[in-house]
């Protein structure tokens, strides 16, 4: 390991002066020197092993003058024009001033050097080590680059040819860079530049914001930071009015409006509005991930991603929301969160006008219009519009489920499903309906629920025009037209159009019923079935008919009931043309044409076309009568028989003749009565 790669020592970050140099510093510069030296020393003893206090630190603490040293001066070739002289001329008459070699015949060019290095020169308070070359005719800037070659001049004569051989020239000029960093070897022409540079090694941040306490190593960065507090924003976008502290930020922002993407990837041709985004993108092709976390070994292609990741280990969340107090590890995350409070959506789709709070969300949305799906699965070729969707899809091939619930050990391939699942254990339902007060675990469930109240059905079937309140219902419905049943049971060969129905069916073979009723102990294969069952205990009927006020425990029952008001009968028999309001009624009716009777009694062998008919028949063998009249105690084997019996007690006669107005308690009695009018 080289010295520049190792630990920083006090020698690396110390700055020394000659007696003459110290005299050239004004009180402000001396004070800055004292502060930086003491700060560098304190930084080193804070993060490193104990140090013996150097003499210079003792003197600075006592506000005495520091030590005086001799200095070796670094030279580099002048970037100006080269003056020609005899290439075999030697430098003679070597002279030493304050440890610096000076020659009287080094070149034909008269230089003027700072009195910092030549006691007989005029004083230069700014301490610039520039010199003026009459041969070139201009003042040369100091050397700040890492790539410039530097030459230490020894205190002895040397061959001019040997010194300048790499440049193939006869008369170079030199620029002084006498202030050298002991840690990395970089040279500087001014003391203050070296002082600023040393903060890179020590982590020193001399400039502190009085508003928030944040420290900065450069004054310019502190000035820019102050503008965040003062909201001093000078550069305004003429398109949207957004303002920026820096002109460069405005220029980048305006590319959102113009669509300009000047930075193009040479590998795939993708273009970007910012050069930094192109650099990050190119790492996808190279696979380069140079930033590694020391805690867990995870690597990142961007330094900022590593910095953000490290806060996961430390738990640091320094950016807090003023509205709700929620804290974030990154200021960008806080900025996006704030738009949730303000409702700001600055990114608008040119096609449909939909607005978004994040630019990335707009890009994803635009792919809905263009149909672009740039992320393709290497296994099956399926393409996706989002990288995250591809990542999740790949888990269906690998079987990976990285999100595990600590409560029940259930694993999930989607983080979103994992978060939703955790709310089952906490019973957290943060999203409440303003109409009926019902609460939901997910916001999306609340949105779907509210469509019951509003009657909104935004998803329309292109084949028959039928509308649905949920997209999943539309997708399931469209399979009726296509006849598609992609999910086939390996046990019995039965196929299903929906994956959920297939999963539920498989539990018939396994006998799995993981959901138990706390009231009666009855078990169910689906949580939805348990939810519906619990309503039989609670009597809850949340779905109410707007026409007659009748309430139902299931939304599907309400939908069926509504057809009694509308007269809708969407299920038509292909054999005889008879229509039905329920699909199950059509299936039972079709068995009348086919003669199919799939439900057979184990006792007597009698077969039935309906499961409910077999259940009632079996009660004839067992004598079971589970439906009791609460008034007289009479029991019945069928609930329909109990319903008819109850009308004797209540006097209810719901079936009315439209001809004469006579009412009946049973529908069959009304049908028989209506024959009087027809004959």
From Swiss-Prot:
SUPFAM superfamilies: beta-beta-alpha zinc fingers, KRAB domain (Kruppel-associated box). Its main location: nucleus. Pfam families: KRAB, zf-C2H2, zf-H2C2_2. The keyword Lipid biosynthesis does not apply. The keyword Zinc-finger applies. InterPro entries: KRAB, KRAB_dom_sf, Znf_C2H2_sf, Znf_C2H2_type. GO terms for biological process: regulation of DNA-templated transcription. It comes from Mus musculus. One of its GO terms (cellular component) is nucleus. This is Zinc finger protein 569. The gene is Znf569. Keywords: DNA-binding, Metal-binding, Nucleus, Repeat, Transcription, Transcription regulation, Zinc, Zinc-finger.
């Amino acid at each position: 390991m080289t010295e520049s790669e190792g630990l920083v020592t006090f020698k690396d970050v110390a700055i020394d002066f000659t007696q003459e140099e110290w005299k050239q510093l004004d009180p402000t510069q001396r004070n800055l020197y004292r502060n930086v030296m003491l700060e560098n020393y304190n930084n080193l003893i804070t993060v490193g092993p104990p140090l013996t206090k150097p003499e210079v630190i003792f003197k600075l603490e006592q506000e005495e003058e520091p030590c005086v040293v001799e200095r070796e001066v670094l030279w580099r070739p002048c970037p100006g024009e080269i003056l020609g002289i005899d290439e075999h001329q030697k430098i003679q008459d070597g002279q030493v001033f304050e440890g610096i070699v000076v020659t009287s015949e080094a070149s034909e060019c008269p230089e003027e050097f700072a009195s910092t290095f030549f006691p007989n020169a005029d004083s230069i308070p700014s301490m610039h080590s520039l010199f003026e070359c009459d041969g070139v005719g201009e003042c040369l800037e100091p050397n700040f680059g890492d790539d410039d070659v530097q030459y230490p001049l020894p205190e002895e004569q040397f061959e001019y040819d040997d010194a300048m051989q790499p440049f193939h020239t006869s008369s170079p000029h030199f620029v002084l860079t006498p202030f050298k960093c002991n840690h990395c070897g970089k040279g500087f022409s001014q003391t203050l530049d070296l002082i600023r540079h040393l903060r890179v090694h020590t982590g020193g941040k001399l400039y502190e914001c009085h508003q928030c306490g944040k420290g900065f190593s450069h004054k310019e960065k502190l000035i820019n930071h102050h503008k965040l507090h003062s909201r001093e924003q000078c550069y305004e976008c003429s398109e949207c009015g957004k303002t920026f502290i820096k002109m460069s930020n405005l220029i980048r922002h305006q590319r959102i409006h113009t669509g300009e993407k000047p930075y193009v990837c040479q590998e795939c041709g993708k273009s970007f509005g910012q050069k930094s985004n192109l650099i990050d993108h190119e790492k996808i092709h190279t696979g380069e991930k140079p930033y590694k976390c020391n805690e867990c070994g995870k690597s990142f292609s961007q330094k900022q991603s590593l910095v953000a990741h490290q806060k996961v280990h430390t738990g640091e969340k320094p950016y807090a929301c003023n509205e709700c107090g929620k804290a974030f590890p990154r200021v960008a995350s806080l900025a996006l969160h704030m738009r949730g409070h303000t409702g700001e959506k600055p990114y608008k789709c040119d096609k449909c006008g939909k607005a978004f709070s994040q630019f990335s969300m707009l890009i994803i949305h635009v792919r809905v219009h263009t149909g672009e799906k740039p992320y393709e699965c290497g296994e099956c070729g399926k393409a996706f519009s989002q990288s995250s969707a591809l990542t999740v899809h790949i888990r269906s091939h690998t079987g990976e489920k990285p999100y595990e619930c600590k409560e029940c050990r259930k694993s999930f391939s989607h983080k979103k499903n994992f978060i939703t699942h955790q709310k089952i254990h906490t019973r957290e339902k943060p999203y409440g309906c303003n109409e009926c007060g019902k609460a939901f675990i997910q916001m999306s469930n609340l949105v779907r629920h509210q469509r019951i109240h509003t009657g909104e059905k935004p998803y329309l079937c292109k084949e028959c025009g039928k509308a649905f309140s949920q997209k999943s219902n539309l997708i399931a419905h469209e399979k009726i037209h296509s006849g598609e049943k992609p999910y086939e049971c390996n046990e019995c060969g039965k196929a299903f159009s929906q994956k959920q129905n297939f999963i539920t069916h498989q539990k018939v073979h396994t006998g799995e019923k993981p959901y138990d009723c706390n009231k009666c102990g009855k078990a169910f294969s689906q949580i939805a079935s348990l939810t519906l069952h619990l309503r039989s205990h609670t009597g809850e009927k949340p779905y109410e008919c707007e026409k007659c006020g009748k309430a139902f425990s299931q939304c599907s029952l309400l939908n069926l009931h509504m057809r009694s008001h509308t007269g809708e009968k969407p299920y038509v028999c292909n054999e005889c043309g008879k229509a039905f309001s329920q699909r199950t009624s059509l299936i039972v009716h079709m068995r009348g044409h086919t003669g199919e009777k799939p439900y057979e009694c184990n006792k007597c062998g009698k077969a039935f076309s309906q499961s409910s008919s077999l259940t009632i028949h079996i009660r004839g063998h067992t004598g079971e009568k589970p439906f009791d009249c609460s008034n007289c105690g009479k029991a019945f084997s069928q609930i329909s028989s109990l319903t008819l019996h109850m009308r004797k007690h209540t006097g209810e006669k719901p079936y009315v003749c439209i001809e004469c107005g006579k009412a009946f308690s049973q529908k069959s009695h009304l049908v028989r009565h209506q024959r009087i009018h027809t004959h």
